């Protein structure tokens, strides 16, 4: 796609020459790392060129072929590949549902993983699927999605956001710490591979607006049930700024 600087042709051998060279740079820069982040999210233009059309494969199949190739590269170089999982969910038609806050009764009526079930053989088992949910991860649909991953024996890591593109610079409600706490509890309950906190610069380029979100991830990632949000805010204000509880400046 000439209009895109972040997408690739999975049927072009030169794609892998470029990507693997970039991956090698990353491995050299981080020689003691455990993972290799391969990306793969938010793709809109795979399968549009003549080379891909000639394969007779769908855009989803082409992307999963790419995923298999880059995962093998990661494994061959002693790393665990991480792939952001939105594209398979979009292919299956459950992406918007997974993001929604629909009730359990509403979700039951429309939940359908048939396409994912049929394509399960395309999902590399050595890959960690980064399940990103920047708002409330405890919704019924999202819980069902985590159950699907578990039932299929796939490895999953959670991703929260200390800042996201749709969140203002200031104020950021509780620095999104309730979302961090909720997802961290799900990670513990479902024995996922781990959790991380992203911070997107389109949400704010200023670190002071996201530090409390990072600290919340450290707090609740280790122990999601130790403190409630108000207790966390008070502890943060005392330790980071020296505020006293009676100051009411949390």
Predicted features along the sequence, with ranges:
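Substrate-binding groove of N-acetylhexosamine-processing glycoside hydrolases
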Residues: 13-28, 32-36, 42, 53-250
């Amino acid at each position: 796609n000439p209009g895109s600087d972040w997408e690739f042709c999975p049927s072009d051998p030169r794609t892998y020459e470029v990507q693997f060279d970039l991956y090698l740079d990353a491995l050299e820069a981080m020689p003691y790392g455990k993972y290799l982040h391969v990306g793969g999210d938010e793709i809109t233009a795979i399968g549009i060129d003549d080379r891909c059309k000639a394969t007779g494969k769908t855009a989803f199949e082409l992307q999963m072929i790419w995923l298999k190739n880059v995962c093998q590269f990661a494994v061959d170089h002693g790393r665990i590949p991480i792939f952001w999982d939105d594209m398979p969910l979009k292919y299956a038609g459950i992406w918007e549902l997974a993001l929604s806050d629909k009730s359990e009764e509403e979700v039951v009526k429309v939940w359908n993983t048939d396409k994912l079930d049929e394509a399960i053989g395309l999902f590399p088992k050595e890959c960690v699927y980064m399940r990103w949910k920047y708002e409330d991860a405890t919704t019924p649909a999202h819980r069902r999605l985590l159950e699907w991953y578990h039932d299929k024996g796939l490895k999953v890591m959670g991703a929260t956001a200390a800042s996201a593109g749709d969140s203002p610079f200031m104020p950021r409600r509780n620095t999104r710490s309730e979302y961090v706490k909720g997802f961290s509890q799900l990670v513990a309950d479902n024995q996922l591979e781990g959790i991380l906190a992203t911070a997107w610069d389109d949400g704010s380029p200023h670190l002071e607006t996201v530090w409390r979100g990072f600290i919340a991830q450290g707090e609740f990632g280790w122990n999601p049930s130790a403190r409630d949000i108000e207790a966390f805010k008070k502890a943060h204000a005392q330790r980071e700024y020296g505020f006293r509880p009676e100051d009411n400046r949390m």
